[in-house]
């Protein structure tokens, strides 16, 4: 099964990715992991990526796509994979189609975990972190026993500056605008499957499981 996982920040992609790879024994391939592995192994594309990163420059698409090609050609991807964080643009998605064709494979599903942006705002702005021990809480989903005080060490809880409402709202807005063309692209190809991410996390996985179970 060859899958792509999509969803806005706070949609719960990480949790679902863990459950998918654990049950179906396929590699979870994130963009960051791909780059780190390629640079560590000093592959041709990894060395090219390193030269851009060391200069503080953006890695061009052709290098990123080359790294994806290298990674998907590896033996652990024979039974399938879960791509996370790639593609980000329609140009990258088109290049991925070519890679899959060259490998004699196809993308089975693009799973988009759908959550209303108002709920995402609540999820993302409710996070609180202990100044002393780093324990994480959520005002609604995992509140401390006593307001603004860490249950574990009694330290003061704070909200990270990038978790404030304005910053989060802007981040979501940018993500929505960036992902829409990609979702439209995959919808036209018939790959796109929308998953209700507003349910309990186990129900979200149950819905994914029903959908992809036939591919195993």
Curated annotation (Swiss-Prot):
Name of the molecule in the record: Adenylate kinase
Main location: cytoplasm
Binding site for ATP: 10-15, 127, 136-137, 199
Record-listed Zn(2+) binding positions: 130, 133, 150, 153
Region called NMP, residue ranges: 30-59
Start and end residues of each stretch annotated as LID: 126-163
Upper lineage: Bacteria, Bacillati, Bacillota, Bacilli, Bacillales
Cross-referenced HAMAP family: Adenylate_kinase_Adk
Organism annotation: Bacillus cereus (strain G9842)
Record comment regarding domains: Consists of three domains, a large central CORE domain and two small peripheral domains, NMPbind and LID, which undergo movements during catalysis. The LID domain closes over the site of phosphoryl transfer upon ATP binding. Assembling and dissambling the active center during each catalytic cycle provides an effective means to prevent ATP hydrolysis. Some bacteria have evolved a zinc-coordinating structure that stabilizes the LID domain.
Compartments it resides in: Cytoplasm
